[in-house]
Amino acid sequence: MKEKNKHILVAMSGGVDSTVAAALLLAQGHQVSGVTMRVWDTEPLGDGREPAHIRDARKVAFDLGIPLHVVDLREEFLQQVVTPFCEEYLSGRTPNPCVLCNRVFKFSRLLREADRLGADALATGHYARIVEHDGLKVLAKGSNRQKDQSYFLFTLTQQQLQRVVFPLGEMSKEEVRTHAERLGLHVAQKGDSQDICFIPDGDYIGFLERQSHATDTEGSIVHVSGKRLGKHRGAYRFTVGQRRGLGIAWPEPLYVVAIDAAKKQVIVGEKEHLHVDRLVTTGTNWIVAQPQQPLQARCRIRYRHQEAPCTLVVLGNDRVEVRFDEPQSGVSPGQAAVFYDEDRVLGGGWIA
C-alpha cells in the first residue's frame, strides 16, 4: 500500500516487530493508530493493573505519538482458542492455536475494529509479504527465510488480503532491531516470544490439567505390532514423534507414532513407522483458486519443516489429499499443512 495518508490500524503486541511496523508506516506518511488485544493474563494483576505487554504497547505508542486502543477479548479467547486447544489435546491431536488466533482474532476481529475506527487497512508485524499474481493478492514468504511466518497465515482470504499490510515482509530481524535502536525505542532488544502466549512457561501438561481438569487417566502404551509395553498416566501427555519420556525399555529407540484417545492408547514404534506418504487435510482454505485437477506443489507440515514436493488432490467438502513424492516423518494430526508454489502460499488445512 503505497498511497499516502491512509489510516492504518497496527496490531501492537508491545514487542519490537509491531512497534517497528508502526514506525515504518508513520515514516511513509500514513495516519497510524495502534490496537492491542487483551486475551489472557499470565501474571497476577491487582485492580486496574494491566499486563506487561499492554504497558509496553502504551509506552511505544506514546513514544511514536499515536493513539492506542485496547480491546478486551479474554472471554472470546477462552471460548474460541483456549477451550478448543484443550479439547484437541485431550482428543489425541496436536493443535496450533497461533493459526486459530490469527484467523479468529487478528485478521477477523481486528479488521472489524479497523472498520469501527474508520481505518482503511490493518497492519501486523508478521514476517510475510503480499504479492500480485494472476490478478490476485497472494500471500508469500517473508524475504528473511529464518523468520518467515507465512505458515501461520494460510487462513487469510482474498477479502482480508485486500486490507492487510505486512511492513516487515522485506526485512530481517537484525534490520528491525537496528531500526528500533535508531529510533531510540525501549523495545529494541526485547526478546522474541518463544512459546504459546497463554502458556509462557511451556508447561502444556500442567496447563491442561489446570484449565480443562484433565485427570491422570491411565492407559496403555502399545507397540505397532500390538504388544502392550507399559502404562501411561494420560494420552494428552504425548505427541506424535515424541521419543523421550516414554518410560519403556526396547532394543531400538521408540517413537510415538499415533494416539488413540478413545481407547486411551499411545502407539509406539521404530523410526520407520513415523514415515507416511500421504495425509488428508480438513477445513482447507484456498488463497488462490481451488485447483480442478491434481496439482504439483510443496507442503509444509510444521513450522520448521522444509516444504516437501507433493501432489494435491481435492476430495471435496474442504478436504485435500496430499501425496508426497517421498515419505515424510512426524505428521501430527491437528497441525497445519500449508501448500506452497515456490514462495507463494496456495492455501492449507488441518491434518486429519
Swiss-Prot record:
Where in this chain does the entry annotate a coiled-coil region?
none
Identify the InterPro entries for this entry.
MnmA-like, MnmA-like_C, MnmA-like_central, MnmA-like_central_sf, Rossmann-like_a/b/a_fold
Region entry Interaction with tRNA: which residue ranges?
Answer: 147-149, 302-303
Keyword Hydrolase assigned: no
Q: Name one GO cellular component term.
A: cytoplasm
Q: Which GO terms describe its molecular function?
A: ATP binding; tRNA binding; tRNA-uridine 2-sulfurtransferase activity
Q: Which reaction does it catalyse?
A: S-sulfanyl-L-cysteinyl-[protein] + uridine(34) in tRNA + AH2 + ATP = 2-thiouridine(34) in tRNA + L-cysteinyl-[protein] + A + AMP + diphosphate + H(+)
GO terms (BP aspect): tRNA wobble position uridine thiolation
Q: Which family does it belong to?
A: Belongs to the MnmA/TRMU family.
HAMAP family under this entry? tRNA_thiouridyl_MnmA
- So what does this one do? Catalyzes the 2-thiolation of uridine at the wobble position (U34) of tRNA, leading to the formation of s(2)U34.
From the Swiss-Prot or TrEMBL record, give the protein name.
tRNA-specific 2-thiouridylase MnmA
State the organism named in the record. Answer: Syntrophotalea carbinolica (strain DSM 2380 / NBRC 103641 / GraBd1) (Pelobacter carbinolicus)
- Gene for this protein? mnmA
